[in-house]
Amino acid sequence: MITVNNLVHHEFIGLSVSVTSVSNESLRLKGTVIDETKNTIKIEVDDNVEKIIPKKGSIFVFELPTGEKVEINGNILSIRPEDRIKKRFKKI
């Protein structure tokens, strides 16, 4: 089960997300995560409209299945998803 405390150790694909702070204002978007790489998150914002957001310099707000919202700095997510799941993070 995904919780606020273990979100960074789970897959983001399928979660609702909004990008609240980014260097490019046109990338302030809200949608569903459909893919993730080491440096980017791909979001489906409308039907069949996909946007690629750089992780570095962005702030993401993920909505968990329970309805809770979690804000995460994209700079700490800039590692491969499969490595992030295994990595231990310091409490923030």
Swiss-Prot record:
Subcellular location: Cytoplasm
Gene3D superfamilies reported for this sequence: Ribonuclease P/MRP, subunit p29
Signal peptide stretch: none
InterPro entries: RNase_P/MRP_Rpp29-subunit, RNase_P/MRP_Rpp29_sf, RNP1, Rof/RNase_P-like, Rpp29/RNP1
Keywords associated with the record: Cytoplasm, Endonuclease, Hydrolase, Nuclease, tRNA processing
One GO MF term attached to the UniProt entry: ribonuclease P activity
UniProt record, GO biological process: rRNA processing; tRNA 5'-leader removal
UniProt catalytic activity: Endonucleolytic cleavage of RNA, removing 5'-extranucleotides from tRNA precursor
Keyword match GTP-binding: no
UniProt cross-references to Pfam families, sorted A to Z: RNase_P-MRP_p29
GO cellular component terms, semicolon-separated: cytoplasm; ribonuclease MRP complex; ribonuclease P complex
Primary location: cytoplasm
E.C. designation(s): 3.1.26.5
Subunit record text: Consists of a catalytic RNA component and at least 4-5 protein subunits.
Protein's job: Part of ribonuclease P, a protein complex that generates mature tRNA molecules by cleaving their 5'-ends.
Family: Belongs to the eukaryotic/archaeal RNase P protein component 1 family.
Protein name, UniProt field: Ribonuclease P protein component 1
Organism field: Methanobrevibacter smithii (strain ATCC 35061 / DSM 861 / OCM 144 / PS)
Classification lineage: Archaea, Methanobacteriati, Methanobacteriota, Methanomada group, Methanobacteria
